[in-house]
């Protein structure tokens, strides 16, 4: 009995060669629309889909394969006489292989000038239906959605006259993943179009970007997936220019670093980070000086860290950076001389280019946190705050220099793990106290790290002070200005302590926990 294949593809890469090989093996080819034209033009004989259905393609191609003569040929179980008799009685010929890929919905909605009508028109209906029918009947039917699988199918057909059950099952699983992702993307697009922020069903689709050697620890398996609709300002979109492939921990740290740098748009800024916490942030009129400040913030912790810059790296800055052991450098661009310095002297240094002009787009993405048996979803902590909305709650007002430092520190503190404390001046961090289970311990940690650089320093806290003992510790260290959200039932005790020691304290009214 002659084997039959139905071919209908939007991605025509390799399809002519695949069809030619099938012809050599004696297969009969059914095809549709543009695929049939491409095959006919290449000299591959095909049968038109309407010759099988007895019904013309119509409505601009919207209706062409949704017909019992197609789906009966795909779904008929070869092990059931009743199915085979029904097919025979209704003159339905069996189809043994389906090669289909879908209308380019993703590519369409990524176009900057796409219209809603264009998006709707590129939703494939017949393609997913054929794929699902064939995949459901994988006991008898081979289904191919990815040109990368053409070779393995041809090899098995040439060797054995049919594909193995294991191959058919694997390809069916791939099809169901593919159609599920396709539908999820359509659902995501329509959900956004209607402005639904809390859908009763959450469908997300990601594409495998990089298999990883291991996860957070060597005993953990891991992979890196990228959103099907890529975010421009993200570690997934960065271009790697040098060094080993990124590890699981590299990617998490790099993501944390670029989230921080987004908040420092106006001035050349350098962020150094280790284990998801900033260990140095420097801001200046030029990127070289910003590097100096970030490095001087904590010359010990920066060792083996990640550095992200929001301006092009020049030769002078590269010379300074190459003297420090770093895992990753991320910047919008590098001068040729700077890149040569870094690559020539650091063969394993991971150097990434990530244009900074798209950074605001990444702020609109939701954040997902996995818990056992569930998923937490929240919008990002990117509330637009203005110092004009802050409240000075003490008798003493901040000086102009203190006000600048308080604003700088408030940008930085929301990226420190809670309980988070940071000590800064107006252009660099001096001490970081992250992740302690009581706030006064974080205060002590940050102050101890700042040590002899406390003259003129200020302190920021990601959440309110539950007791006045925090203010007592701060005053004892000689720090004269504090910024915190406020909101404790004991706020007045902290205010009175600040007044007692001549401190100025600002309440922002916005908490910035980070867990």
UniProtKB/Swiss-Prot annotation:
Residue ranges of domain MGS-like in the record: 1-145
Task: Give the matching Pfam families.
Answer: AICARFT_IMPCHas (PF01808), MGS (PF02142)
Q: Do you know which InterPro entries this protein is assigned to? A: AICAR_Tfase_dup_dom_sf (IPR024051), Cytidine_deaminase-like (IPR016193), MGS-like_dom (IPR011607), MGS-like_dom_sf (IPR036914), PurH-like (IPR002695)
Superkingdom, taxonomy of origin: Bacteria
Gene3D superfamilies the record matches: 3.40.140.20, Methylglyoxal synthase-like domain
User: Pathway of this protein?
Assistant: Purine metabolism; IMP biosynthesis via de novo pathway; 5-formamido-1-(5-phospho-D-ribosyl)imidazole-4-carboxamide from 5-amino-1-(5-phospho-D-ribosyl)imidazole-4-carboxamide (10-formyl THF route): step 1/1; Purine metabolism; IMP biosynthesis via de novo pathway; IMP from 5-formamido-1-(5-phospho-D-ribosyl)imidazole-4-carboxamide: step 1/1
This enzyme catalyses:
(6R)-10-formyltetrahydrofolate + 5-amino-1-(5-phospho-beta-D-ribosyl)imidazole-4-carboxamide = 5-formamido-1-(5-phospho-D-ribosyl)imidazole-4-carboxamide + (6S)-5,6,7,8-tetrahydrofolate; IMP + H2O = 5-formamido-1-(5-phospho-D-ribosyl)imidazole-4-carboxamide
Which key words are in the record?
Answer: Hydrolase, Multifunctional enzyme, Purine biosynthesis, Transferase
Q: What is its EC number?
A: 2.1.2.3, 3.5.4.10
Gene Ontology CC annotations of this record: cytosol
Reply yes or no: does the keyword Thylakoid apply: no
Q: Which NCBIfam families match?
A: PRK00881.1 (NF002049), purH (TIGR00355)
Family membership: Belongs to the PurH family.
Supply the name of the protein.
Bifunctional purine biosynthesis protein PurH
Tell me what organism the protein belongs to. Answer: Streptococcus pneumoniae (strain Hungary19A-6)
Name of the coding gene: purH
């Amino acid at each position: 009995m002659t084997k039959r294949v139905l071919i209908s593809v939007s991605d025509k890469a390799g399809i002519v060669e695949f069809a030619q090989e099938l012809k050599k093996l004696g297969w009969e080819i059914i095809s549709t629309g543009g695929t049939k034209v491409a095959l006919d033009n290449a000299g591959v004989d095909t049968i038109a889909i309407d010759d099988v259905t007895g019904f013309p393609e119509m409505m601009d191609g919207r209706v062409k394969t949704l017909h019992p003569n197609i789906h009966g040929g795909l779904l008929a179980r070869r092990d059931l006489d009743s199915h085979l008799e029904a097919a025979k009685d209704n003159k339905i010929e069996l189809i043994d292989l389906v090669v289909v890929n879908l209308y380019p919905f993703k590519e369409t909605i990524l176009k900057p000038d796409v219209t809603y009508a264009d998006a709707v028109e590129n939703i494939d209906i017949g393609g997913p239906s054929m794929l699902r029918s064939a995949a459901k009947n994988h006991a008898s039917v081979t289904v191919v959605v990815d040109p990368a699988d053409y070779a393995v199918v041809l090899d098995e057909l040439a060797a054995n006259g049919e594909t193995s059950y294991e191959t058919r099952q694997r390809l069916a699983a791939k099809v169901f993943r593919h159609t599920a992702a396709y539908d999820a993307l359509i659902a995501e697009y329509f959900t956004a179009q209607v402005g639904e922020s809390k859908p009763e069903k959450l469908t997300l689709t990601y594409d495998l970007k990089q298999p990883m050697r291991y996860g957070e620890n060597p005993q953990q398996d891991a992979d890196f997936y990228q959103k099907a609709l890529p975010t421009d300002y993200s570690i997934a979109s960065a271009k790697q220019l040098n060094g080993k492939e990124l590890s699981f921990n590299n990617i998490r740290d790099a993501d944390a670093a670029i989230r921080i740098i987004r908040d420092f748009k106006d001035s050349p800024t350098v962020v150094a980070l280790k284990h998801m916490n900033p260990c140095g942030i420097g801001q200046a009129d030029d990127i070289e000086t910003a590097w100096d400040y970030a490095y001087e913030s904590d010359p010990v912790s920066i060792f083996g860290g990640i550095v992200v810059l929001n301006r092009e790296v020049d030769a002078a800055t590269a010379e300074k950076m190459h003297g420090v052991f770093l895992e990753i450098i991320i910047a919008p661009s590098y001068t040729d001389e700077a890149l040569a310095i870094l690559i020539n002297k650091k063969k394993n240094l991971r150097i990434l280019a990530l244009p900074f002009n798209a950074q605001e787009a990444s702020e609109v993405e939701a954040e997902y946190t996995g818990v056992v048996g569930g998923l937490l979803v929240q919008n990002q902590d990117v509330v637009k705050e203005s110092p004009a909305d802050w409240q000075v709650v003490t008798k003493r007002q901040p000086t102009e220099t203190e006000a600048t430092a308080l604003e700088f520190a408030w940008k930085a503190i929301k990226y420190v793990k809670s309980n988070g404390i940071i000590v800064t001046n107006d252009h660099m961090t001096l001490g970081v106290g992250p992740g302690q289970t009581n706030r006064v311990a974080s205060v002590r940690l940050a102050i101890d790290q700042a040590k002899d650089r406390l003259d003129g320093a200020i302190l920021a806290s990601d959440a309110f002070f539950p007791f006045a003992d925090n203010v007592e510790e701060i005053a004892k260290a000689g720090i004269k200005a504090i910024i915190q959200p406020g909101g404790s039932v004991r706020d007045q005790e902290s205010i009175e302590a600040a007044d007692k020691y001549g401190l100025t304290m600002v309440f922002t009214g916005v908490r910035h926990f980070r867990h």
